[in-house]
């Protein structure tokens, strides 16, 4: 049977009541007052972060006929991971170990992983490349959940780049993890249209919803050792991590507007306003006219900065990130 827990049901309801999902790994939860009732299905571990994206897939995996045996996270992504957070609360509630693996491929981490005796690992947002020896520890391997239509937009920021590049469609891919980034055999995949007003936050929620629908099928395929379909990497695209991009880099107002939507809420674009860096949460293209908000000017028109703030609130550990040092990040 699936995990039975009023606590997790409440966490699930609260999560899906949000208008948008983030990748920022700083979520915490109130502690549960008791332990969950777990089933006796296949032993699975989960790898991810205390973010909306990861949490949604952890909660979905626990609704399958499984027996959770551990949670794995990567503590270098955010200071919150070293303390109490959503993953540590759920691990305690399930009565399973939480492995904070600084280097998932070293011997110490692999011994901890082997001790879980997992039949499979479900992974949703993890900032380390899992090597062949770690991938081979669970009997049926690792299922990775990547928010793009692989092989397009491989890499760490696929939702950002789909919006910033002006794509009309993206999707979610559930694939067998391989030692190469986002390159393993595909077990399930679904497309999601990108609307003209989608931000990274609203699009991520749509992608997760589609991924949750596909998870049972992909998980069954993983346990059945189905080979999946190899992506054609000759037609792939790989995009790098994103820093706080300056809207002055944009060639047009349309491009700048996409940069704003792509950066919200995970990694905000910025622009100088009266000589001071401001981080832009929302903006719209306009013809040249008077407005009460700051306007950036481009060859194709203006970009009205509808909502800005003084700090970025990002999770990247960058020494000169503005919310730490008061200067524009150089990433």
Give residue spans per PLM region:
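One-carbon transfer enzymes
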Residues: 1-270, 285-305, 309-316, 321-331
């Amino acid at each position: 049977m699936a995990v039975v827990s009023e606590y997790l049901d409440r966490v699930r309801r609260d999560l899906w009541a949000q208008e948008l999902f983030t990748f920022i790994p700083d979520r915490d939860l109130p502690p549960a007052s008791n332990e969950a009732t777990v089933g006796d299905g296949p032993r699975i571990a989960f790898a991810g972060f205390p973010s909306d994206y990861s949490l949604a897939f952890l909660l979905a995996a626990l609704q399958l006929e499984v027996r959770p045996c551990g949670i794995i996270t990567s503590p270098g992504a955010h200071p919150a991971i070293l303390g109490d957070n959503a993953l540590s609360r759920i691990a305690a509630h399930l009565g399973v170990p939480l492995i904070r693996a600084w280097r998932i491929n070293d011997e110490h981490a692999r011994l901890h992983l082997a001790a879980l005796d997992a039949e499979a690992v479900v992974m949703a947002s993890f900032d380390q490349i899992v090597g062949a020896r770690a991938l081979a520890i669970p009997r049926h391997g690792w299922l990775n959940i990547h928010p793009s239509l692989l092989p397009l937009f491989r890499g760490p920021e696929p939702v950002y780049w789909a919006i910033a590049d002006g794509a009309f469609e993206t999707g979610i891919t559930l694939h067998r993890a391989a030692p190469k980034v986002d390159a393993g055999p595909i077990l399930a995949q679904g497309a999601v249209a990108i609307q003209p007003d989608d931000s990274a936050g609203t699009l991520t929620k749509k992608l997760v919803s589609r991924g949750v629908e596909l998870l049972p099928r992909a998980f069954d395929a993983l346990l059945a050792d189905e080979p999946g379909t190899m992506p054609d990497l000759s037609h792939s695209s790989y995009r790098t991590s994103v820093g706080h991009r300056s809207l002055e880099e944009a060639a047009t107002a349309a491009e700048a507007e996409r940069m704003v939507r792509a950066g919200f809420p995970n990694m905000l674009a910025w622009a100088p306003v009266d000589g001071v860096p401001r981080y832009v949460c929302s903006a719209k293209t306009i013809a040249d006219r008077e407005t009460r908000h700051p306007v950036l000017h481009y060859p194709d028109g203006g970009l009205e900065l509808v909502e800005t703030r003084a700090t970025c609130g990002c999770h990247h550990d960058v020494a000169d990130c503005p919310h730490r040092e008061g200067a524009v990040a150089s990433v």
